[in-house]
Amino acid sequence: MKELKYYEKVALSNFDILEMLDNKAEIVLYPNLIKYETIDDVLGPYGACVLLFEAKKNYGHWCCLFKREDNSIEFFNSYGGYPDNSLKYIPLHYREISNQYYPYLSLLLLKYPHKLYYNEFKFQKRANDIRTCGRWCVLRLLLKHLDIYEFKKYVDDMCSYYKVTPDELVTMITI
């Protein structure tokens, strides 16, 4: 259990995430969204993207989005919430200088002709010593065949079975 607590504190890098996903996702820094014309461009050839909302240079909160079989898109934030909700946690001064002032993701999603789903469940505990957001993105993308309710049930069932917290579970699965 001590080892799990250690790894809960270790934030995944973009390289870690890509390796765990077998390079089948795009990694995009939020400030770079301005360079994209469509959400399909962001999702790339595998229809999946892990997006970093930067709180400081190359550090912040990972979220992900992916295209489902019916062409709808799911946005997943391990804290729960709609796309661009994470912007409000970035200091305004840094948002301005880092090109994260405008809700570029929402603007791209508004142009998309199919449905958007987002995660309303809180999987990750908000605490300075828990840095599992990248791990949650990896798990969500590996289990993207499940809808969000099935994913939530899977997490709840596994937590009950192993008698662990959600952050301990996702850490167990991804170390």
From Swiss-Prot:
Superkingdom per UniProt: Viruses
Protein name: Uncharacterized protein V9
